[in-house]
Amino acid sequence: QVLDYAILVINGADGVQGHTRTLWRLLKLYQVPVFLFINKMDQPGADKEALLWEIKEHLDSNCIDFTQERNEGFYEEAAMCEEAAMEKFLSEGSLASNDLAQMIAKRELFPCYFGSALKVQGVEELLDGLYEYSRTPKYPDKFGAKIFKIAREEQGNRLTYLKVTGGTLHVKDMLHGKAGEEEWAEKVNQLRIYSGEKYEAVSEAAAGTICAVTGLTKT
């Protein structure tokens, strides 16, 4: 519920598995736009055409090979995913990057990239695609946040994980909420940006930032 986009990684040697379909259903449930990276294409038995057919068959027929971008037939195949895009393609013969970006954001199109993370093959193309076809949401100036996880670290500190959905959150800000009929107000002691188990303490978190907050007991 806090994701702007998701990257779904599929093992090219194994193809679409049960857990792949489970993740796909969850992403559909929460309407998260998806980029797909089919990994381990350097392994024996990894067949790109067969994998793409399997992905279209078991996930969505609008999963398109973006490694063939700008090749003959690419824009026509992409345009077939959405009626307005097809009308533009028929009149202009192509689609703009923004057209594709809008289709991806609306889950009408799912870009597929193929490669090997271990050998750093296809990774740059994926990153280029994310840069070109993802769009940063417009956030309001008024502060807002969505809490998605509560945890405790080894020292016992209670961590409230949230995404800032508007404005900016600062250390020492007072947050207000309601638990049942009881209204509460608590101070932000610390803001942490996590990367794995490590974190960086920051003084503020702008809209779009995912962070962990200490000092809250009522969330």
Predicted regions and their residues:
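Structural and coupling elements of P-loop NTPases
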Residues: 1-219
